[in-house]
């Protein structure tokens, strides 16, 4: 998995590229901590290029949501692929995340 981040006015945007699976979980968490300066801003995760997610990947997103919330910041997911949306629905996590059709829409929801 490749993870890139950039600071925007409303939030830090994290772009995921590839799989978010058991093999990527530790790197995901480490990179998120570094990219967000230990959760000092709202976060938008751009899932456009997220190709696959497993149960550990879901746990990683839940961890990110919990960390953001415990630091009084908000998390938004953008451009979630249908396959991942289906997994959210099957695991009953579809209500656990605020999802948006674009990064811009996710950022606007933070205002």
Segments (PLM) and residue ranges:
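Acidic phosphotransfer microenvironment of two-component signaling modules
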Residues: 82, 104-105
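Conserved catalytic submotifs in the C-terminal HATPase_c
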Residues: 8-9, 48, 104
């Amino acid at each position: 998995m490749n993870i890139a981040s950039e600071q925007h006015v409303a939030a830090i945007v994290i772009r995921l590229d590839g799989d978010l699976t058991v093999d990527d979980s530790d790197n995901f968490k480490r990179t998120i901590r570094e990219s967000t300066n230990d959760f000092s801003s709202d976060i938008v995760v751009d899932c456009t290029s997220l190709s696959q997610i497993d149960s550990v990947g879901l746990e990683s997103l839940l961890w990110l949501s919990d960390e953001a919330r415990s630091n009084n910041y908000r998390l938004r997911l953008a451009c979630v692929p249908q396959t991942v949306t289906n997994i959210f629905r099957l695991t009953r996590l579809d209500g656990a995340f605020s999802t948006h059709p674009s990064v811009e829409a996710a950022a606007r929801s933070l205002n």
